[in-house]
Design a protein with these regions (language model features):
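Short, well-ordered coil↔helix boundary/capping segments
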Residues: 37, 63-66, 82-89, 119-122, ...
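Catalytic active-site module of serine/aspartate enzymes centered on a nucleophile-bearing elbow/loop
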Residues: 93-137
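Alpha/beta-hydrolase
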Residues: 1-74, 86
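Active-site proximal loops enriched in glycine and acidic residues that flank catalytic Cys/His/Asp
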Residues: 47, 80-83, 106-109
């Protein structure tokens, strides 16, 4: 279980679905899991990927982010979670303006950043399956 959950998750006490009596129990479990099971080097590598990931870097786009977005040719569906506190829907709205053949389909989920975790949100999974089928058809 991750801490990237929305305020609604805690208000709705959805942590009980995972067997926790209260939010504090959930957070302690998360901290223990990360301390015992996550290698610090893996976390540092993940952070570095987030910090350095930029499709506009390099000689082709010369740091022109909009030009890089406009070069995407694949049919694209952007599915941000409106309650994600890490990756905001506003960012995808901006990107959607420049990606040809893209559509923006935000999803509401109390699971926030964790909406896409398998088993968390059946509505998210249904929407994801529907959009994948559309992309592949």
């Amino acid at each position: 279980m991750q801490v990237g959950l929305s305020q609604d998750f805690y208000r709705e006490k959805l942590y009980k679905k995972f067997g926790f009596k209260n939010a504090e129990e959930l957070l302690k479990d998360w901290a223990n899991d990360h301390a015992k099971n996550w290698d610090a080097n893996n976390l540092l590598s993940k952070l570095q990927t987030w910090q350095l990931n930029d499709i506009s870097k390099g000689p082709l786009y010369k740091n022109n982010y909009i030009k890089a977005l406009k070069s995407i040719r694949a049919k694209t569906i952007l599915m941000p979670c409106n309650q994600d506190l890490y990756f905001r829907t506003e960012d995808n709205k901006y990107e959607n303006k420049f990606i040809p053949r893209s559509s923006l389909r935000p999803i509401d989920s109390s699971y926030g950043h964790c909406a896409a975790n398998p088993g968390n949100d059946k509505n998210f999974e249904k929407q994801l399956d529907k959009n994948i089928k559309e992309l592949l058809s």
